[in-house]
Amino acid sequence: MRIGLQIIRFDWPGSPQNLGPTLANIATTADQAGFASLWVMDHLFQMGDEFGPADAPMLEGYSTITYLAARTSQIHVGVLVTGNVYRHPGLLIKTVSTLDVLSGGRAYLGIGAGWYEREARGLGLPFPPLDERFERLEETLQIAKHMWRGDRSPYVGRYYCLTEPINCPQPLRRPSPPILIGGEGEQRTLRLVAQYSDACNLYLGATSAEFAEGLPRIQHKLTVLQQHCQTLGRVYEEIERTVLATVHLAPGHMQVDEIVQLCRSLAAVGIEHVIFNMPNVHEIAALEVFGEEIIPIVASYD
C-alpha cells in the first residue's frame, strides 16, 4: 500500500505572505517521509462548510503543483482532480505533459467531470449540464490517449476539434502519465475508469463514523468497477485503486494505530493507495510521524 497527501486549504497563519515557503516545506517533508504522491485541488473558490468560506485563500492547481514538483525529487504529483470543463483538452494535455517532463516523469492526470458550479459561474467559466460535462470528459480522455500516443491526425468530436494535435515533447513517463478519474458514479464514472483510466479515486470520509460506513460502499464500488472491466475486456488489476480521506493526526484526535488499522481495512477491500488530507498539515509534525510510524508499516499491505 502507498500513502499520498492532498493539500486542500491555504488559510494558515501568515497567509498569503508565507504560502510559498510553507508549501515548499510541506512538499519536501512529504518527499523525504516517503509519501508516494502529492496533490492539490482544482478549485478556484474554497468549497464552504468545514473547508472554509468561498473567499478563503485558494491557489490555482497547476501553478501550485508545478511549484511543488520543482521542490521535490521522488514524490509523484497531480491535481485531484482537474475540473474538465475549466480547460480546453488540448491545453490540459500539454500542461500535464509539461509537468511530467519538468518533474522527471512524476505527473498524474487527475480528472473528473467537475461539480462546483458557483466557482465556474463566478469566474465566467463554462459549466454545461451534467450529461454534457460527462460527454466532454470522455472526449478529453480520448484526446489524451490520441495526443500521448503521438497521433497527429485531427481529432473531431462533438465538442472538441483539434486539427493538428502536436505534443512535443511527449511526457517522459511512457506510454503516458497515469490517468486517474475521480468519482464513483456507477453508470458513467466507473465505466470511464474501466475504459480509459489507469487509476480510480473514491471518497472514504472524514470521521470514524464515515470510515465505518464508507468501507462497504468502497467495496461495492470496486465490485461495480470489476463488472465494467469484464464487460469492456479490461484487466481490473491494471487499475490502481485509490481512496481519499481526511485524518487529523494529533493528540486528542486520531492516533497512529487508528490510521494503521484504517489502512489495513482498506487494503482488505482492495485499495492500493490511500490519499490523506490533514487540517494540520502546515504544522509538519504529522508528516514526520507518517514517515516514521505509518508508511513503513502499511507498505507491506496488499
What are the roles of these predicted feature ranges?
Residues 1-71, 177, 212, 277, ...:
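N-terminal beta1-alpha1-beta2 module of alpha/beta enzyme domains
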Residues 2-21, 82-154, 203-204, 210:
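Flexible, glycine-rich active-site loops centered on histidine and acidic residues
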Residues 3-7, 38-40, 76-79, 107-111, ...:
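Hydrophobic faces of well-ordered beta-strands that scaffold small-molecule active sites
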Residues 7, 31, 36, 131-173, ...:
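An alpha-helical appendage that flanks or caps ligand/catalytic pockets
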Residues 7-21, 80-90, 131, 174-185, ...:
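Active-site mouth loops of central-metabolism enzymes
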Residues 17-30, 92-95, 183-195, 253-266:
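Short, acidic/polar
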Residues 31-32, 65-74, 96, 100-106, ...:
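Acidic (Asp/Glu)-rich catalytic clusters
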Residues 45-51, 119-128, 173-175:
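Short glycine/proline- and charge-enriched loop/turn segments
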